[in-house]
């Protein structure tokens, strides 16, 4: 990387001829790391978290836990953090927190503090100030929390004056983010009554299931009387754990996407289909496009399509697909980045909510593909991408880590792709481009 750009090496014609799969190790899951930090904070006693991801998002979350007064120890080299929980109590009743650009910190901590007791001044990065908070803040106001927004209503920064939970039920619209529901679920144990959450919207349920399973691992049972209702019986408390965090499947997917793109087998260590993470569904999508998956002791091994296209023996034939990616929407960019090389159009649906993430991802994808000369079409909640050969292009990343990491894949197969501001990947995968360079050196003869 130089001058804050990354020139992607085009290695497609230089792939080593080998039957040995590429073996990759990725850092811990951001989603699980940040959930486990909050659950450990709310538990009674000392939790030891292993395999912790250290990135911009998780560091902001950890700093917030520390700024609230919780005792922690941090060993970045060993990826271990300990948190001394106080059984739902907070060490301080007034403080200022900055969540950075971390959506999980923004939503999860806001919900927990909003049903606690105290005065909490909440700030964020400029990027996070553009992302919606209103559904969660409105729900907290219904529960008795005083919310004072200091800028645009429903956005950071704001001050919470919390008096505990004033009622035993709430409704939440998750049309913009499933994190609103996850946040309220985790915080619900602070209520002295049975707590019921009525949900409007259906997207992101894979993340909700992750939250529910992790709550159960930490000792709290969540009931689901109907598909759109959650009930948390009173009297439950989180227990401190020695907890192993899974590798980040979202990060693993960039390397699995190389399988159809470059025609190489890939195994990401310790990634298995029984993962808590919804992005494991992306591997099933790649199977439908022609790949074959084997869940081995080491991790899922993904094999490239065996058939070859009419374009020549170099090109693995993988198929376009129409797919609802609402359960693994973080991989919409990944699929879009390799879709031009498929043998038929790809239509990604169920992703309207990604317009409200680090960037308007639907618009960003279509803008950058169009600049590469690739035909694509967008609706409010879908993208259709047609086969073609991408032209040289400097890809704008919109301060969005997934745009940077995803579109680097495109350049592995076509000349002239440059990633602008690759450092934005520090949000979730600080050394992504270093790992990518190592992979390139291993699989190519350049």
Label each residue range with its predicted role.
Residues 1-446:
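Short, structured segments at the rim of ligand-binding sites
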